[in-house]
Regions:
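Short Pro-Gly-centered flexible turn/kink motifs
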Residues: 43-45, 93-106
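C-terminal edge beta-strand
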Residues: 131-140
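Hydrophobic beta-strand positions in extracellular immunoglobulin-like domains
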Residues: 48-49, 63, 107, 122
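Surface-exposed binding patches on compact interaction domains or structured appendages
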Residues: 54-100
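Bacterial Sec-dependent N-terminal signal peptides
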Residues: 1-23
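A short beta-strand micro-motif common to beta-rich folds, especially ectodomain repeats
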Residues: 114-126
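Beta-sheet-dominated interaction scaffolds and their linkers
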Residues: 19-54
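Short, surface-exposed loop/turn segments at beta-strand-coil junctions that are enriched for proline
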Residues: 108-113
Length: 141
């Protein structure tokens, strides 16, 4: 009976730790810093992520903060879709093993000098305990 209890405890710990194992990683840096002139545009600033598991995953992202000036014209793209503005969140299209996806932003400052930061929390839908913060810092001169 003691052996069975020990095995059950060991099995429950292994399930807990197995689910916390990362299924994706950030390719390169999780922080992008961009600088541009007020009469120019930021065509794309992209942060890539990669599925490092052996099965397909669905990454969820949420906007944690957004301090971009309201005058700036912004949009963002995720793996599988683009949206006007900086939405509150969404889900990537399926990422197969070893496949990369991304979050990207586009900024047209409309001659408005300033700076702003947008941060996205990203995690696997099946493993929300493991997450990363992707940060875009933009300065318009």
């Amino acid at each position: 009976m003691k052996k069975i209890c020990c095995y059950l405890i060991l099995l429950s710990f292994s399930f807990t730790f197995a689910q916390n194992k990362p299924t994706f990683s950030v390719v390169g840096n999780a922080i992008n810093k961009e600088s541009l002139l007020k009469n120019k545009r930021l065509d794309v600033s992209k942060i890539k992520v990669e599925n490092i598991s052996n099965k397909p995953i669905f990454l969820v992202w949420e906007t944690v903060s957004n301090t971009f000036p309201k005058e700036w014209d912004c949009s963002m793209c995720q793996h599988g879709a683009c949206q006007i503005g900086i939405p509150k969140g969404s889900v990537f299209s399926k990422l197969n093993p070893d496949q990369q996806g991304f979050i990207a932003i586009h900024v047209i400052p409309v001659n408005k000098i300033g700076n702003g930061t947008v941060k996205f929390k990203i995690y696997d839908k099946a493993n929300p305990a493991y997450s990363k913060i992707l940060t875009f810092e933009v300065e318009v001169l």
